[in-house]
């Protein structure tokens, strides 16, 4: 087993997660099985109760573990399935050691940080490194990311553990990559290497010497700066890797390859890589990176959320949208809308902000209502669901988004004006969303319905979402929720047009809803974003993107296969315009008329649909129409339909 430890210096958030994932991507391209471990030196047992504003999203694994969002990077980059033990926290280690002490395993010894805590860390790493993460084969390389920065007091037991670990596994099996910031002050315009020198000095003072120094900078670093770091940090010039800010994280593995990382690791860790037998993995990454640069036609998606001030709160949602947009050959434009800004209270207190946010929502091509907890902003989510339903706007709801859609439908279609969730109003007369029996109110951590669960489609179901998945009988997706749709109201909801197209295996929990006579109004109780991959986008997200650019019907007609041109990284606006014009001319020749029988331009459709704004309830009517632009008049495409 080979180990690569990735540490950080100067500041946190310097990009260790992406660097660690890129190491794994490069090694996988050499046909090596790779696993990852993330170490978080906080005392929490897991990330389940973290505030999204402080740590970003909580990522959920197959086994129900609530972990740091960096594990999502590992799974997406490497296309592997990690487990709860792949995330180590100080809390887990101390809990393990204390439990051993209580059961007498230390035979009366004084339990100390060294050796008991450090030994527990090393044993945990060795055990988890052997756990298969892709199929049944054991990994050959383990990438370990140590969270925080070198010198943090909470991380010192882990640094000491790895100081010992390098001798435990021998030098040829252990490598340290140190990621450090090289700032570029505007006053001088010159890269400063002193922070990196100090960081490396501190790392060496702890007993670890970096084999690779990965310099993060705003702009590319010149050879002179690279040689200076090499000289003062006692490493060879080929051991200094410069990663500047890039347009896409998909470029990072490619840049590291150009810097000779594979060759260095092959020699340093004695990997015996046969360069002639490398897989096409990196070619896929090259295509993906190139496509991010060449795609020009945009699709705008409004994320109506509760934590939009911190983008990492929706990290997996954003990644899933990016995967789907690239697959559909579109450039993603995200429109973050704080759901509380869509509520009546904002209209009274800040009318200009209220109208502005509603206008941004109306101008978007599609809407996504993600998950969340608590009452704040819930009414805004419900209003967004209503607008999407009444105005035929493509929408995807996730978790709380499904619950908001059900409550809105019950209020405005069933006439149950007090419909609500017991999370917000425990005394409501019409509890459309109720607490699950598994939820223990005395404890928050680990009490939700978590992890991968089976979702079964209804017999004879021909729904859009089922077709997007390939018409299976069932699917498996990851869950994270404490509340569910009240099954008592399902018959009433279905009678008025809301279809519950999938349930859990016991047919008691509603998992997916769709609306009849709507281009794309889908909501899931599970979180499809967790299983989206760059080369395998999540079906619900792909459906949202395609519906938002009027391509979903064609995609379904093709058997849910993207056209070669959509999968190409060389598509352009001119090419699509040419293809559309060619097909238009053919239709003219066939019909013998001056206008194709179905040749209604999208702009014409917009004009005819601009009146739909009047269907919005009176309290939000002026928000979308008051500034003179209808909800579907400016969605950023501006071209006639060229059906594929």
UniProtKB/Swiss-Prot annotation:
| PROSITE patterns registered for this protein in UniProt | GATASE_TYPE_1
GO MF assignments: ATP binding; CTP synthase activity; identical protein binding
Organism domain of life: Eukaryota
Could you name the active-site residues? 399 (for gatase activity), 527 (for gatase activity), 529 (for gatase activity)
What residue ranges are annotated as transmembrane?
none
User: Which GO cellular component does the record give, naming just one?
Assistant: cytoophidium
- Residue span(s) of domain Glutamine amidotransferase type-1: 300-551
Its UniProt pathway annotation is: Pyrimidine metabolism; CTP biosynthesis via de novo pathway; CTP from UDP: step 2/2
Q: Which Pfam families match?
A: CTP_synth_N, GATase
Q: What Enzyme Commission number(s) does the record list for this chain?
A: 6.3.4.2
What are the UniProt keywords, alphabetically?
Answer: ATP-binding, Glutamine amidotransferase, Ligase, Nucleotide-binding, Pyrimidine biosynthesis
Could you state one GO biological process linked to this protein? Answer: pyrimidine nucleobase biosynthetic process
Q: Which reaction does it catalyse?
A: UTP + L-glutamine + ATP + H2O = CTP + L-glutamate + ADP + phosphate + 2 H(+)
Tell me, in a sentence or two, what this protein's role is.
Catalyzes the ATP-dependent amination of UTP to CTP with either L-glutamine or ammonia as the source of nitrogen. Constitutes the rate-limiting enzyme in the synthesis of cytosine nucleotides.
Q: Which PANTHER family match?
A: CTP SYNTHASE, CTP SYNTHASE-RELATED
Q: Which NCBIfam families match?
A: PRK05380.1 (NF003792), PyrG (TIGR00337)
Q: Which family does it belong to?
A: Belongs to the CTP synthase family.
Q: What is this protein called?
A: CTP synthase
């Amino acid at each position: 087993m080979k180990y690569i430890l990735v540490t950080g210096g100067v500041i946190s958030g310097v990009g260790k997660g992406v660097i660690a994932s890129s190491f794994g991507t490069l090694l996988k391209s050499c046909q090596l099985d790779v696993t990852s471990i993330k170490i978080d030196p906080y005392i929490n047992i897991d990330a389940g109760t973290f505030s999204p504003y402080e740590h970003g999203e909580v990522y959920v694994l197959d086994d129900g573990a609530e972990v740091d969002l960096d594990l999502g990077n590992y799974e997406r980059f490497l296309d592997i399935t990690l487990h709860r033990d792949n995330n180590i926290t100080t809390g887990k280690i101390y809990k393990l050691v204390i439990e051993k002490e209580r059961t007498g395993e230390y035979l009366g010894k004084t339990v100390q940080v060294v050796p008991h805590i450090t030994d527990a860390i090393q044993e945990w790493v060795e055990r988890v490194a052997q756990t298969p993460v892709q199929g049944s084969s054991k990994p050959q390389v383990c990438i370990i990311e140590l969270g925080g920065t070198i010198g943090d007091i909470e991380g010192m037991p882990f640094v000491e553990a790895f100081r010992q670990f390098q001798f435990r596994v021998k030098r040829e099996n252990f490598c340290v990559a140190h990621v450090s910031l090289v700032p570029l002050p505007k006053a001088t315009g010159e890269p400063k290497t002193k922070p990196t020198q100090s960081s490396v000095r501190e790392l060496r003072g702890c007993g670890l010497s970096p084999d690779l120094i990965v310099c993060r900078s705003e702009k590319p670093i010149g050879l002179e700066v690279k040689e200076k770091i090499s000289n003062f940090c006692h490493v060879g010039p080929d051991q200094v890797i410069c990663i500047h800010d890039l347009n896409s994280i998909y470029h990072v593995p490619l840049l590291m390859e150009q810097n000779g990382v594979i060759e260095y690791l092959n020699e340093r860790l004695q990997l015996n890589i046969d360069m002639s037998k490398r897989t096409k993995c990196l070619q896929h990454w090259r295509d993906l990176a190139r496509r991010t640069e060449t795609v020009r036609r945009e699709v705008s998606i409004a994320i109506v959320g509760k934590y939009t001030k911190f983008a990492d709160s929706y990290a997996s949602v954003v990644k899933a949208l990016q995967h789907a947009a690239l697959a559909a050959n579109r450039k993603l434009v995200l429109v973050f809308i704080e759901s509380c800004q869509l509520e009546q209270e904002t209209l009274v207190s800040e009318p200009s902000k209220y109208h502005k946010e509603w206008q941004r929502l109306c101008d978007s091509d599609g809407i996504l209502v993600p998950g969340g907890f608590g009452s704040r902003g819930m009414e805004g989510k419900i209003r967004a669901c209503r607008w999407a339903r009444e105005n035929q706007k493509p929408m995807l709801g996730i978790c709380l988004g499904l619950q908001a859609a059900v409550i809105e439908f019950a209020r405005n279609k069933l006439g149950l004006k007090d419909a609500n969730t017991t999370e917000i109003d425990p005394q409501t007369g019409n509890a459309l969303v109720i607490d699950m029996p598994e939820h223990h109110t005395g404890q928050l951590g680990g009490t939700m319905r978590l992890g991968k669960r089976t979702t079964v489609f209804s017999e004879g179901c021909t729904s859009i979402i089922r077709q997007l998945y390939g018409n299976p009988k069932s699917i498996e997706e990851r869950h994270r929720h404490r509340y569910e749709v009240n099954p008592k109201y399902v018959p009433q909801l279905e009678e008025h047009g809301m279809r519950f197209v999938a349930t859990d295996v016991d047919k008691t929990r509603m998992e997916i809803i769709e609306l009849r006579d709507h281009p794309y109004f889908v909501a899931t109780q599970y979180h499809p974003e967790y299983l989206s991959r760059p080369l395998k986008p999540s079906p619900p997200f792909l459906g949202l993107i395609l519906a938002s650019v009027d391509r979903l019907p064609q995609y379904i007609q093709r058997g849910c296969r993207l056209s070669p041109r959509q999968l190409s990284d060389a598509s352009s606006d001119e090419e699509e315009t040419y293809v559309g014009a060619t097909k238009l001319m053919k239709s003219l020749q066939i019909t013998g008329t001056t206008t194709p029988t179905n040749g209604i331009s999208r702009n014409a459709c917009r004009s005819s649909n601009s009146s739909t704004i009047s269907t919005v309830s009176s309290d939000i009517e002026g928000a979308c129409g008051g500034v003179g632009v209808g909800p579907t008049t400016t969605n950023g495409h501006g071209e006639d339909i060229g059906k594929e």
